[in-house]
Amino acid sequence: MSGISPSSSGLLPMPGAPSSSWSAYKARVAALLGHHDTKVVVAFWLFGLINNVLYVIILSAAQDLVGSLPKGVVLLADVVPSFLTKLIAPYFIHRIPYRTRILIFIALSAAGMLMVALTPATQSVAIKLVGVILASISAGGGELSFLGLTHFYGPMSLAGWGSGTGAAGLVGAGLYVMFTDWWGLSVRSSLLISACFPAIMFLSFFVILPLGPLREGTRKDYDAIPDLEDEDVNHMDQGTASSALLAPGPSVASTAYSARNNQESLTVRDRMNKVKKLFVPYMMPLLLVYVAEYTINQGVAPTLLFPLEESPFDEFRAFYPFYGFLYQLGVFISRSSTPWIRIHHLYLPSMLQIANLVLLTLHAMYFFLPSVYVVFIIVFWEGLLGGGVYVNCFAEIMENVPAEDREFSLGATTVSDSGGISIAGLLSIVMETKLCNYQVAHGRDWCQRISAQGQ
């Protein structure tokens, strides 16, 4: 039995122990919340949550925004601008300070959600889609910026970001179901509430996140200081390097910014060559898993309907948001798992996701799965696979890519998820229509009984 006391170990005292008291608990929790590492994890968790939650809410609201139009239309408006942002921005965004980027992202996302919420149902869907596009640009720029920022804060920041993005899916889909189905709020009211969320990003960056590593970037001299020589960094194994970044002190921050300073001198051709090296090990499996899962979500899921008397729902429009909730629950669990479970072979879960797409497409056509609850399990499994590939892809980059290339690589690889979703959006527009027509032709007209909810 160790003789280390709770107070010296940082653990909370056991209830009933002599050292336990309400004041002791409060003091210990306050110390934990004030710790540098805790602030980093909380800040990046909130970055991931807020940057992605509006995207999820928009997709959850797709059926109510466009009614009988293919949901892939909303998916494309929600993803293509983000994809183009991620495709172009890595070559110049390093010139924009992180503080300025945060303010831009907040303004774009809030304006986009207000435009979607305040556009009357009687007006053109195109106006709503413009608002979706603004939010998409913000999300794309935010993702590549925050993932690049994890380079300076280490593995725990990536764990916080991954868990936050997973929580965004769960919170976004869950909130929309709660607002519209449980509380009976209109779509407009639900989206207006959502437009307030970007303010949390401001608090996360300017209040919670320790800005010491960023302030180091204002120095003109980025040479590593004597207690951490360049030679030491170059010969340090990746696991040790990652651990050293766990709680970046001045020397680690200086080294990180030295690498960034070297990267800023690279030409566009140099950066494109670096992207080519990322494609097969990291970008391709991420692309494949996103093509498969978002084709399921937007092209197949709207047609995965059952007779209402055999389901827990009162109307057909309730299937789609609940599928989204289960999917996002799986994503949240798997994106929060990297401290305990690591996936090094990224192609295996990608292939399993493609198998899910084939299975659910066949069921949409031939209706052979015995219960909607079986579909619930498959959709949850789909979320586990998708979230696992996402967070483990960036964890592999953080471990295996040299420090001088890491910030750029983390940001550049984000183009794969948006690229995959864009491809899925195009496929979904065709697949949803074809599957619905096939079902109607074979005596199942449930997909035609869904209309947009009044705002």
Curated annotation (Swiss-Prot):
Membrane topology qualifier: Multi-pass membrane protein
Subcellular location per the Swiss-Prot or TrEMBL entry: Vacuole membrane
Keyword Transmembrane recorded: yes
GO biological process, any: regulation of intracellular pH
Chief location of this protein within or outside the cell: membrane
Signal sequence interval, chain numbering: none
Keywords: Amino-acid transport, Membrane, Transmembrane, Transmembrane helix, Transport, Vacuole
Record's keyword annotation contains Transport: yes
GO cellular component: vacuolar membrane
Xref: Pfam families: CLN3 (PF02487)
Superkingdom of source: Eukaryota
InterPro entries documented for this protein: Battenin_disease_Cln3 (IPR003492), Battenin_disease_Cln3_subgr (IPR018460), MFS_trans_sf (IPR036259)
Transmembrane segments: 40-60, 73-93, 102-122, 129-149, 159-179, 191-211, 286-306, 313-333, 346-366, 367-387
Function: Involved in vacuolar transport and vacuole pH homeostasis. Also required for cytokinesis.
Family (UniProt): Belongs to the battenin family.
Name used for this protein in its record: Protein BTN1
